Amino acid sequence: MNRPSARYALPEFTERLSTGLRTLDPYSKLLDERIVFLGTPIDDTSANDVMAQFMHLEHLAPDRDISLYINSPGGSFSAMTAVYDTMQFVSCDVETICLGQAASAAAVLLAGGTPGKRLALPGARVLIHQPSLPAPVQGQASDLVIQAAELARTREQLEELLVRHTGQSPERVAADIERDKILDAPAAVAYGLVDRVVPSRKSSAAAPGAR
């Protein structure tokens, strides 16, 4: 698994099992607790890591929730849709929790959690905007036409996902993503991107929600 880089050495935990000692880093320990942490930009590598963890946890216990903690600036739309589709594909309910930020593609993953189980910490922020092409954009005129058509299709798909998971009208979503729309945690609840703001783990027990 490609773990987020740190400016210092991550601590390790040693546990005594019936089969002997086992040493874990924090991310492996979180996985034991059915917590997947997305703390990097979303690209093919991080998406593959998240998808592999989801499928592993579903195999271990298909009837238990998976918690996806998000602190990400967003990233690749295609990588995001791979994770999103996996979230919908697995039989487990997926609880999403935003701490820090869920921006751009990460906001869609936050909103795509199981209804009633989409949470944000008080200091979190969520940002939505329209997709864009990475710079520099190069190629022949015919190539640019193809890229423009794909960008328009991507925007339509993004709008459909936000409408589906927020309950906002297509017209409002289309207008809101024209420029960066930044929402604090209460505003994200009002918009429908998350269900509740949770100040502590004691208050994070989510009511069961239909998928």
UniProtKB/Swiss-Prot annotation:
Entry's Gene Ontology molecular function annotations: ATP-dependent peptidase activity; ATPase binding; serine-type endopeptidase activity
Compartments where located: Cytoplasm
Gene field: clpP5
Disulfide-bonded cysteines: none
Protein's name according to its UniProt entry: ATP-dependent Clp protease proteolytic subunit 5
Xref: SUPFAM superfamilies: ClpP/crotonase
Subunit and partners: Fourteen ClpP subunits assemble into 2 heptameric rings which stack back to back to give a disk-like structure with a central cavity, resembling the structure of eukaryotic proteasomes.
Keywords: Cytoplasm, Hydrolase, Protease, Serine protease
GO biological process: protein quality control for misfolded or incompletely synthesized proteins
A GO CC annotation given for this chain: cytoplasm
Annotated catalytic residues: 104, 129
Transferase listed as a keyword: no
Top-rank EC class of the record's enzyme: hydrolase
